[in-house]
């Protein structure tokens, strides 16, 4: 499998930030993610340290701000400066619990600028498809504290996924590889398939896992 360099990947999202943001704003992905999180609240403590690794234009960050019941410190990380700017603007425009604190960091998801065991919850979407799974998941495991949770949305192979692969120049990992590599670093709690009437289910599934 061919994996793109960080510079190559970020250039794609620098060029297509507006399209990416528009597409995910209107395709119902955000509603589906929020529905799941409201029905299945993440077990985060008050003051939880949360990392959105590869936040893009803020899809998961915004969902967390709306559904987390306890105050949290959210760090949104992306390699694309333009995506971070878009995420920051989106957060400013949305109403959310003012007890949440949020910061933005430009960094590479395979060399995160944080010490080991820095976060209680790590969320990510649209990042691991650009990386060798063992490398990407290993780095997320490194910064996640023991007992902490990983919430991610792997792209699953499908006809709709093939179009996204062409547009955004990534390659979906085989589901078996996702499962095996996740189990190397985490205890899998749930592998969730979205209902077929929700567009997110055409291209993504959801994995919740815990670091031992």
Language model region names:
Residues 170-185:
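Short alpha-helix
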Residues 135-146:
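A short glycine-rich, Lys/Arg-flanked "PGG" loop and its adjoining helix->strand segment in the class I
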Residues 3-44, 59, 63:
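Conserved class I S-adenosyl-L-methionine
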Residues 123:
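A conserved beta-strand element that flanks and buttresses the S-adenosyl-L-methionine
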Residues 194-212:
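Core SAM-dependent methyltransferase catalytic element
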Residues 148-154:
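Conserved beta-strand signature within the Rossmann-like core of class I S-adenosyl-L-methionine
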Residues 51, 57-110:
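Class I SAM-dependent methyltransferase SAM/SAH-binding core
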Residues 111-116:
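Short conserved loop adjoining the S-adenosyl-L-methionine
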């Amino acid at each position: 499998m061919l994996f793109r360099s960080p510079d190559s990947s970020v250039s794609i999202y620098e060029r297509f930030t507006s399209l990416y943001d528009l597409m995910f704003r209107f395709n119902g992905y955000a509603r589906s993610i929020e529905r799941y999180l409201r029905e299945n609240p993440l077990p985060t403590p008050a003051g939880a340290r949360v990392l959105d690794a590869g936040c893009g234009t803020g899809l998961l960050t915004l969902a967390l701000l709306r559904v987390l019941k306890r105050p949290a410190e959210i760090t949104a990380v992306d390699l694309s400066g333009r995506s971070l700017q878009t995420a920051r603007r989106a957060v400013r425009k949305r109403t959310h619990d003012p007890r949440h604190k949020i910061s933005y960091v430009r960094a590479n998801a395979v060399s995160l600028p944080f010490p080991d065991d820095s976060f209680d919850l790590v969320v990510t979407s649209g990042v691991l498809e650009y990386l060798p799974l063992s490398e990407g998941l290993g780095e997320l495991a490194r910064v996640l504290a023991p007992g902490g949770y990983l919430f991610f949305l792997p792209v699953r192979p499908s006809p709709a996924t093939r179009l996204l692969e062409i547009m955004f120049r990534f390659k979906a990992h085989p589901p078996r590889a996702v499962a095996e590599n996740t189990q190397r670093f985490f205890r899998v709690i749930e592998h969730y398939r979205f209902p077929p009437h929700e567009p997110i289910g055409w291209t993504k599934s959801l994995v919740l896992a815990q670091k031992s």
